[in-house]
Amino acid sequence: EDDLEDFNPTVS
């Protein structure tokens, strides 16, 4: 899910 950071900076 860390890759989601690329699309959703809020997940970082």
From Swiss-Prot:
Its main location: secreted. Belongs to the SA81-like family. This is Venom peptide Sa81. Keywords: Secreted. It comes from the Eukaryota. GO terms for cellular component: extracellular region. It comes from Sphex argentatus argentatus. Expressed by the venom gland. It is found in: Secreted.
